């Protein structure tokens, strides 16, 4: 299982949000320094989110993100504001190993087919953001139906992996809700990385036993509720 420390970037700074709300941002400084710190502690991959992109400014932070990709040299997956084929291609061409497409994939699932044919399905990850079993899109504001049906559609259209985020617990550091994760993992055949609420080594062990391919650690890691070493040991 891969542990992905999150490097969420807003206004050129590394931040963490609560429940995805911009006004809750806590700044942790320069994104590259944060990324290098996690790598020095043993991280072999990073989960980068362009929050300005998610909030509507897809080109902001491009220089910062490219700098992290080039100077760290580790595996990266990137999401946030990828809402066109041009957006997707530009990130893939700049060296991101895997892009995460959520709202764009829900609005136009054929984008997954096009991109997987051009770049390979292993570089295309679909984001499944869910609340109470229902997919939510457009900044987690619009309910869109059963999340398992969306996961199946995304895979059929070409996604080589999924990022599952339980938005009900994201950023709260209160632990995971294992049931929907197990439901998803038992029905799909592609790797699934899990985000949202992961706070303790026991959370990670539960996900490992359920056969999750990876976990994203954000608020719990930055607040010190779990150390990267503890996470890596639980995942190992």
UniProtKB/Swiss-Prot annotation:
Top-level EC class as recorded in UniProt: isomerase
Catalytic activity, reaction form: 1-(5-phospho-beta-D-ribosyl)-5-[(5-phospho-beta-D-ribosylamino)methylideneamino]imidazole-4-carboxamide = 5-[(5-phospho-1-deoxy-D-ribulos-1-ylimino)methylamino]-1-(5-phospho-beta-D-ribosyl)imidazole-4-carboxamide
Keyword Amino-acid biosynthesis part of the UniProt annotation: yes
EC number: 5.3.1.16
UniProt keyword annotation of Amino-acid biosynthesis present: yes
Compartment annotation: Cytoplasm
One GO CC annotation: cytoplasm
Keywords: Amino-acid biosynthesis, Cytoplasm, Histidine biosynthesis, Isomerase
GO MF, any single term: 1-(5-phosphoribosyl)-5-[(5-phosphoribosylamino)methylideneamino]imidazole-4-carboxamide isomerase activity
Biological processes annotated in GO: L-histidine biosynthetic process; L-tryptophan biosynthetic process
Xref: Gene3D superfamilies: Aldolase class I
Pfam families given in the database record: His_biosynth
Active site positions: 8 (proton acceptor), 129 (proton donor)
PANTHER family found in the cross-reference section: 1-(5-PHOSPHORIBOSYL)-5-[(5-PHOSPHORIBOSYLAMINO)METHYLIDENEAMINO] IMIDAZOLE-4-CARBOXAMIDE ISOMERASE
UniProt similarity note: Belongs to the HisA/HisF family.
Name of protein: 1-(5-phosphoribosyl)-5-[(5-phosphoribosylamino)methylideneamino] imidazole-4-carboxamide isomerase
Originating organism: Methanospirillum hungatei JF-1 (strain ATCC 27890 / DSM 864 / NBRC 100397 / JF-1)
